[in-house]
Amino acid sequence: GSIDGDGAAAMRYTEARLSKLAEEMLRDIEKDTVDMQLNFDDSLKEPVVLPCRFPNLLVNGASGIAVGMATNMPTHNLGEVIDGCVAYVKNAVARVENPEVEPITVAELMEHIKAPDFPTGGTIYGYQGVRDAYETGRGRIIIRSKAEIETEDNGRERIVIGELPYGVVKSDL
């Protein structure tokens, strides 16, 4: 899908030029580091997950529906996620060295991973939904558009929307 409401791409549209970071996501894939499964038409094998060297699931998010369950995990900023992972590992090492050290809390992780980072921008309205999502796995995050009022040469004003909430299709506006 896309911001224009296009449907998901078929296999013939999935060719891409990889960035260095994307190449890291595929490193060691031939070494049986992850399970493989048949693709949509059983013609090829594909990885169940990518053998990524960073927490790609948090960075790219996930969305899906299955029988009796669903998930909708938003995208996050790569730098913030790495900082959160470093804090988590440092805490784990400190706990091994000193068993009296408390496990890192969600609030402490949120000092590094502040909130989801949506690709189309927008402003998160309120913070309680983010906190709820991180603490319980369930939360409601409301995103507002970012807009400006511009004055045209003829004196008329117009509203220019610069950032849309994630998931909003332009043509539906």
Enumerate the language-model features and the residues they cover.
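Catalytic phosphate-handling regions of large nucleic-acid enzymes and associated NTPases
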Residues: 1-137
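Gly/Lys-enriched N-terminal cap/neck module of very large, oligomeric protein machines
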Residues: 141-173
